[in-house]
Amino acid sequence: MHLPFPRRKFLKAALTTGAASGLLLTSWGRKVLAAVANPETNRVFSHGVASGDPTHDSVLLWTRISVANSKTVSWELALDSDFARVVQSGSRETGQARDHTVKIIAENLHPGQSYYYRFRADGVVSEPGRTRTLPEGSLARLGLAIASCSNFPFGFFNAYEVIAADPEVDFVLHLGDYIYEYGSDGWGADEGAEIGRVHSPAHEIVGLEDYRQRHAQYKSDVGSRLMHAAHPLICTWDDHESTN
């Protein structure tokens, strides 16, 4: 049975019904939800934004543009979600050789500080991401969300949506199996066929283009986009990143 209510429509409904109440509580969260539901944003940034590998004074920022004719991507890092206090900015060239992705290592940052970032390409601005550097010294608390074994066809990434909306989370620690290499006959294939989440490409991934396509599919999931926009990721690998 196919779901009658697509995830994009769910997000649009969330803006008016409070279905994503955790994100709707903040100005930044409302901007993210509006951007993810915006067709123009999805035309250029259908895989969203992400951050990760934080240190006490740096963090990696990422995006992928979905329009092949746009090669210059600009970025901003700010102390506020309105980007009134931009602390770093720049531009980066991208293209087919790097699958139209952009990676920025923002350096010389303050420990334990929250930042907001966004990208611009083809006249369109991405959803604003929120990230954070690692703290220094003794801590009263640290909020970690733990994720693992994210098999796209086996079900929707609603746990990612919960993580995105949790204000107590500082970082997401993903313990591996961020993707699964299976083809359309692998574990979870029956469930995926039932709910309309079949692996792409349909065969087991073995080459660079296969992996790019599979990662792009996982990054296009709404829950994944919300989680990556909300929190920086600290990742370890397990076996399914390459092969079982």
Regions found by a protein language model. Name each.
Residues 1-19:
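N-terminal secretory signal peptides and thylakoid transit peptides that target proteins
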Residues 51, 133-138, 225-226:
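Short boundary motifs at domain starts and secondary-structure transition points
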Residues 3, 25-62, 143:
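C-terminal segment of N-terminal export signals and the immediately downstream linker at the start
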Residues 139-159, 164-244:
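Active-site neighborhood of divalent metal-dependent phosphoester/pyrophosphate hydrolases
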Residues 53-56, 82, 150-152:
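Short polar catalytic/cofactor-binding loops
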Residues 71-141, 153-157, 161-162:
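Extended acidic/polar, glycine-enriched regions
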Residues 52, 64, 76-78, 132, ...:
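Residue-level detector of conserved, well-ordered beta-strand and adjacent loop positions
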